[in-house]
UniProtKB/Swiss-Prot annotation:
Binding partners and assembly: Homodimer.
Organism the protein comes from: Paracoccus denitrificans (strain Pd 1222)
Cofactor: how and how many bound: Binds 1 [4Fe-4S] cluster. The cluster is coordinated with 3 cysteines and an exchangeable S-adenosyl-L-methionine.
Molecular functions per Gene Ontology: 2 iron, 2 sulfur cluster binding; 4 iron, 4 sulfur cluster binding; biotin synthase activity; iron ion binding
Pathway: Cofactor biosynthesis; biotin biosynthesis; biotin from 7,8-diaminononanoate: step 2/2
Name the record gives this protein: Biotin synthase 2
Gene name per UniProt: bioB2
Length: 320
């Protein structure tokens, strides 16, 4: 059956060997299958977020014991960025636990973008919802990518978040694209959603006016004190199916194997790479979640014959 005539559900639910073969075929048509993009993520403002995202330890409404911090000083952010570049990162992603940026913080945020850009790395930020003017100012400062995940399907969304709507997220993505910034948008799996919710989420992303340049697929890492702290872990094959379907639906996008890698075996990660994932975050922390240390990633890359994308060949990137 020709790919374009099949529904996303037919792609997702087909026999796994067929799904993996098709995903790897699509992947090889657009990317070197042995190259993985490596990005670094820094939390520039942690905790105290007014949103009620059920998965997030940074929400002030959840019962986690995470303390709120102030916005990190610009020079400290740039020092961390230099270390990331020296360690091989080709793009630098900065995240703040906000509903949306406040005007008083914009000068510092813009200075961070300009400073990281001057180092020769690509820049990405995730700051919450944006209005049109904020998006244009970020673009003018040199922002390459903006991350704003849709998290899950429109149907399941209100089970996870009530303080902003699914449409709010779509409108922010539209403003980012209108400003000329590349979009990074994905979601989280393993939050109690159905396979149909995962499929619907991917259909929404692929159906944007321009599909995201980067699609982070996060596997829920249950955080103590959050409403999802005791959600059963998603079956590994469902994660692989999600990655493979994302690759087929968005063939030219980077598909990032994002949060949750610290809980995955080498074999599971290898299957995700074979399914079309070609981007990861490096470093031992993703905002507030754990991540494999860089030595462990180096060993895995050596075992699988993978190599990190070099800056000269780099094209896309973003946050979790």
């Amino acid at each position: 059956m020709p790919q374009q005539s099949r529904s996303a559900a037919e792609i997702y639910h087909q026999p796994l060997m067929d799904l993996l073969f098709q995903a790897q075929t699509v992947h090889r048509a657009h990317f070197d299958p042995n190259v993985v993009q490596c990005s670094k993520l820094l939390s520039i403002k942690t905790g105290g977020c007014p949103e009620d995202c059920a998965y997030c330890s940074q929400s002030a409404r959840n019962g986690s014991e995470l303390s709120a911090s102030k916005l990190m000083e610009v020079q400290r952010v740039l020092a961390e960025a230099r270390r990331a570049k020296e360690a091989g990162a080709t793009r630098y992603c900065m995240g703040a636990a906000w509903r949306s940026p406040k005007e008083r913080d914009m000068p510092a945020v813009l200075a961070m973008i300009r400073g990281v850009k001057a180092m020769g790395m690509e820049t990405c930020m995730t700051l919450g919802m944006l209005d049109a003017d904020q998006a244009l100012r970020l673009k003018d400062a040199g922002l390459d990518y903006y991350n704003h995940n849709i998290d899950t399907s429109e149907r399941y969304y209100s089970e996870i978040i009530t303080t902003r709507t699914f449409q709010d997220r779509i409108e922010t993505l539209e403003r980012v694209q209108a400003a000329g910034i590349n979009v990074c948008a994905g979601g989280i799996v393993g939050m109690g959603e159905t396979a149909e919710d995962r499929i619907s989420m991917l259909e929404t992303l692929a159906g944007l006016e321009v599909p995201p340049q980067s699609v982070p697929i996060n596997m829920l890492m249950p955080m103590a004190g959050t409403p999802l702290a005791d959600v059963p872990r998603l079956d590994a094959i469902e994660m692989v199916r999600t990655i493979a379907t994302a690759r087929i639906l968005m063939p030219a996008s980077y598909v990032r194997l994002s949060a949750g890698r610290s809980e995955m075996s080498d074999e599971m990660q290898a299957m995700c790479f074979f399914a079309g994932a070609n981007s990861i975050f490096v470093g031992d922390t993703l905002l507030t979640a754990g991540n494999p240390d860089e030595d462990k990633d180096a060993l895995l890359f050596a075992k699988l014959g993978l190599r990190a994308e070099v800056p000269e060949a780099s094209q896309e990137g973003c946050a979790a």
